[in-house]
């Protein structure tokens, strides 16, 4: 087996960048980083080696030599970016992901999709203050059967629809005792709900949307169909194919939670998984661990699902272990920790506490 094949066999399980001093790399030189291989000593690979491994793992094929060379240049820039992220976010592991041949603008357009805007739809409530004295130290809705398997939005800015359906899936589970995968494509095709004060800021399929607007649409239209009855295509549909006789989950009400982590945790435990917006700047290079960057903007651009929290997930140098949130993403199981992301609690890192919503479900009378 040649050297690349040998490295690739372990690359699938473990591929990440460890810290390298900035003096090691000049922008004009080939990037050399270290790769941890199967628990052995780190192996030194060039950027060409990494790109070959990347193409094999993710099945990347480019239409021309020009496209190949361009993607290689983008890939090298993203290796440098991952190295910077590793320094700024040392409690997580950053490296090569399926997005490593995308520019930042391509990544934002294809894989994010939360629109800016904080105005509440007319039917939204402000969540009541809940008691927080007896919250469990650790909690995870995956352990209680309220979370469907990780999905994949593909190259479509529909993250908002996955965040909204995930919250309603959990709420419907609490209301009915049944976990049913709901249709994101229904929201992509049929939901054109607009911000109440910005008529041109509407849910717009692969071009973005808001979870609260999706809840407003779902409340008005009667609910959502099953995923299997209205399957996801990852494209904007030309027509809405809603069949109201096949609605299986309905919204009774939805609320916005204050920027208070104890209240967020209390609502999570009581009401099920929560729809959350976040800044995804560090997520393009995230491999695993608890992300707690020293610097991260709170400009929200990605919709995710908050499913749990832990009391002690990482320990900065000379400090005791710190708590973290557990987030379900919509980029497939090959990304992150089997499709999940951990981010530290305590400082509204990357805006994770800024736009949090809870939804309650009723049993649809037309459910099949």
Swiss-Prot record:
Gene Ontology MF: a single term: cysteine-type endopeptidase activity
GO CC annotations on file: lytic vacuole; nucleus; plasma membrane; vacuole
Active site (UniProt): 159, 302, 329
Matches recorded under Pfam families: Inhibitor_I29, Peptidase_C1
Compartments, as annotated in UniProt: Lytic vacuole; Nucleus
Signal sequence region: 1-22
CDD domains, A to Z: Peptidase_C1A (cd02248)
EC annotation from Swiss-Prot or TrEMBL: 3.4.22.-
UniProt keyword list: Disulfide bond, Glycoprotein, Hydrolase, Nucleus, Protease, Signal, Thiol protease, Vacuole, Zymogen
Conditions for induction: By high salt conditions. Induced by drought stress.
Entry-listed glycosylation sites: 253
Listed GO biological process terms: defense response to bacterium; proteolysis; response to osmotic stress; response to salt stress
PANTHER family: CYSTEINE PROTEASE FAMILY C1-RELATED
Similarity field: Belongs to the peptidase C1 family.
Name recorded for this polypeptide: Cysteine protease RD19A
Organism: Arabidopsis thaliana
Gene name tied to this protein: RD19A
């Amino acid at each position: 087996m040649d050297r690349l094949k040998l490295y690739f066999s372990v690359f699938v399980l473990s591929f990440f960048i460890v810290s390298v001093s900035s003096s090691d790399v000049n922008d004009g030189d080939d990037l050399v980083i270290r790769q941890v291989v199967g628990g052995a000593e780190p192996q030194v690979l060039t950027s060409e080696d990494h790109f070959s491994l990347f193409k094999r793992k993710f099945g990347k094929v480019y239409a021309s030599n020009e496209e190949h060379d361009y993607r290689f240049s983008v890939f090298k820039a993203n290796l440098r970016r991952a190295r910077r992220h590793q320094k700024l976010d040392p409690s997580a592991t950053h490296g090569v992901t399926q997005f490593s041949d995308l520019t930042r603008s391509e990544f934002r357009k294809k894989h994010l999709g939360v629109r800016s805007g904080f105005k509440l739809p007319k039917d939204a409530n402000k969540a009541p203050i809940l008691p927080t004295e007896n919250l469990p130290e650790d909690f995870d809705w995956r352990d209680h059967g309220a979370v469907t398997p990780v999905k994949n939005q593909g190259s479509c800015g529909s993250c908002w629809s996955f965040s909204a359906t995930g919250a309603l899936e959990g709420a419907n589970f609490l209301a009915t005792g049944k976990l049913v995968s709901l249709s994101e494509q229904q929201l992509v095709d049929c939901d054109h709900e607009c911000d109440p004060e910005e008529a041109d800021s509407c849910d717009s399929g692969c071009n973005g949307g808001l979870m609260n607007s999706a809840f407003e649409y779902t409340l008005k239209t009667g609910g959502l169909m099953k995923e299997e009855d209205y399957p996801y295509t990852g494209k904007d549909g030309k027509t809405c194919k809603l069949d109201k006789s096949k609605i299986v989950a309905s919204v009774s009400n939805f609320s916005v939670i204050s920027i208070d982590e104890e209240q967020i945790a209390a609502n999570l435990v009581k009401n099920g998984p929560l729809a959350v917006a976040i800044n995804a700047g560090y997520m393009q290079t995230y491999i695993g661990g608890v992300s707690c960057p020293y610097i991260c903007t709170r400009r929200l651009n990605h919709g995710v699902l908050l499913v749990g929290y832990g009391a002690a997930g990482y320990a900065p140098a000379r400090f005791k272990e710190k708590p973290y949130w557990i987030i379900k993403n919509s980029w497939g199981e090959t990304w992150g920790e089997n499709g999940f992301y951990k981010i530290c609690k305590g400082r509204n890192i990357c805006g994770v506490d800024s736009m949090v919503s809870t939804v309650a479900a009723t049993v649809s009378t037309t459910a099949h």
